[in-house]
Curated annotation (Swiss-Prot):
Organism the protein comes from: Bacillus subtilis (strain 168)
Keyword Zinc-finger set for record: no
Pathway: Protein modification; lipoprotein biosynthesis (diacylglyceryl transfer)
Keyword Ribosomal protein: no
GO CC annotations on file: plasma membrane
GO molecular function, one term: phosphatidylglycerol-prolipoprotein diacylglyceryl transferase activity
Name of the protein in its database record: Phosphatidylglycerol--prolipoprotein diacylglyceryl transferase
Name of one Pfam family that matches: LGT
Membrane topology designation: Multi-pass membrane protein
Gene name of the encoded protein: lgt
Task performed by this protein: Catalyzes the transfer of the diacylglyceryl group from phosphatidylglycerol to the sulfhydryl group of the N-terminal cysteine of a prolipoprotein, the first step in the formation of mature lipoproteins. Required for spore germination.
Sequence intervals crossing the membrane: 18-38, 52-72, 89-109, 116-136, 177-197, 205-225, 236-256
Amino acid sequence: MNEAIEPLNPIAFQLGPLAVHWYGIIIGLGALLGLWIAMRESEKRGLQKDTFIDLVLFAIPIAIICARIYYVAFEWDYYAAHPGEIIKIWKGGIAIHGGLIGAILTGYVFSRVKNLSFWKLADIAAPSILLGQAIGRWGNFMNQEAHGEAVSRAFLENLHLPEFIINQMYINGQYYHPTFLYESLWSFVGVIVLLLLRRANLRRGEMFLIYIIWYSIGRYFIEGMRTDSLMLTDSLRIAQVISIVLIVLAVAAIIFRRVKGYSKERYAE
């Protein structure tokens, strides 16, 4: 294999002058599947069927905007010189941590307005959010981004990857670590773990906090392999710092809520 390898077309189809990118389609698919799972579970937990539809109508656009703002803020030198690029979200460049912040804030405000338990909503949504993240990483794959350091083709073949993944990791004459795949698989496993934990009937809020811990552990280690990380300093990756902070806060929240008796209600209640 050599420079003749052609990458997959990031554009799915054209609607007149409008190019519809696989990136957006894949993220949309992840959101729809996540919504379907959350709706099924919410009915079992005594919530109205449309609760998560109403929430998602606000949460998804706000999360995407926050994810973009987060990314642009840490790449401001580039975007200050190219302001027209700020709105070109279809090219990639959204940060999951920024989206998570937007989604949590939206969920909290929504729960207050609707007089619902924030923790109950968050617990139900946790597997859906992680599923959306797992699927969404394949949008990065189509854009040939969120990859790791340079590797040999033999290394990728030893991972027994399908040929289409190996070929897509051939970028500008070099093969790269498919870190998008590592994070996607980690997230898919996390979805299974969370679905199994539903049977344990954990204290309310702990399902969501375990999701935070699970995702952050994987993100910390995988981020260290990436070459396109947002950097706080020359050697400090923002996502790794945020991941550590989230792990500490989530563990502390579980302990604090148990000690103070704030988590007496169970997931199924």
